[in-house]
A protein has these predicted regions:
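Beta-hairpin "wing" of winged helix-turn-helix
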Residues: 66-80
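Conserved segment of winged-helix/HTH DNA-binding domains
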Residues: 84-109, 121-130
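Alpha-helical residues within the helix-turn-helix
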Residues: 46, 63-64
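C-terminal regulatory/oligomerization modules of transcriptional regulators
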Residues: 109-165
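Residue cluster at the C-terminal edge of the helix-turn-helix DNA-binding motif
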Residues: 64-67, 95
Length: 165
């Protein structure tokens, strides 16, 4: 699997926003609510070493996917559109690059092979199932809190996981 620079930047952007200090509570009516931290693009760019123009594009894609919200002006910036625990790495990849797995630009279930290659479609489907198993079950919050799911820790504890092949 190839993780593009834009996906890497998008995940790091969301992590930077998720880790921002929480703002004070605001009182709306009779209820105190936590105000989401607002993070400026410049702060994200500096903290994560993301080129500003690239970050601008990434933030626009995250906004279109309803993963972040923004406000202009001197008090403006970006904040998560929903709790970090409800944003999976799969959500981020889909927002930036589209489907998690594709074959020649098509979804695996839409690819057909003749003759001896016919079983290959099932291999691509199985690959997608396994990619989903990890990416849909790891959230921005899991990473921000350095609290990866147990199955991820188990997979990465195997020395073979780190071997280049």
């Amino acid at each position: 699997m190839h993780i593009t620079a834009r996906v890497d930047y998008a995940v790091r952007t969301l992590l930077e926003i998720a880790r921002a200090p929480q703002a004070d509570k605001a009182v709306i009516g009779a209820t105190a609510v936590q105000v989401a931290p607002v993070v400026k693009a410049e702060a994200i760019s500096t903290a994560q070493h993301i080129p500003p123009k690239v970050l601008e594009t990434v933030l626009a894609e995250l906004r279109r996917a309803d993963l972040v919200t923004s406000r202009r002006g001197p008090d403006g910036g970006y904040w998560l559109a929903r709790p970090a625990a409800r944003i999976s790495i799969a959500d981020v990849i889909r927002a930036i690059e589209g489907p998690l797995a594709s074959v020649r630009g098509e979804r695996p279930e839409d690819v057909r092979y003749p003759g001896a290659a016919e079983p290959l479609q099932r291999v691509w489907i199985a690959l997608r199932v396994n990619i989903r198993a990890v990416l849909e079950n790891v959230s921005i919050d899991d990473i921000a809190q350095n609290r990866l799911p147990g199955f991820v820790e188990t997979l990465t504890a195997d020395p073979g996981a780190w071997a280049r092949r």
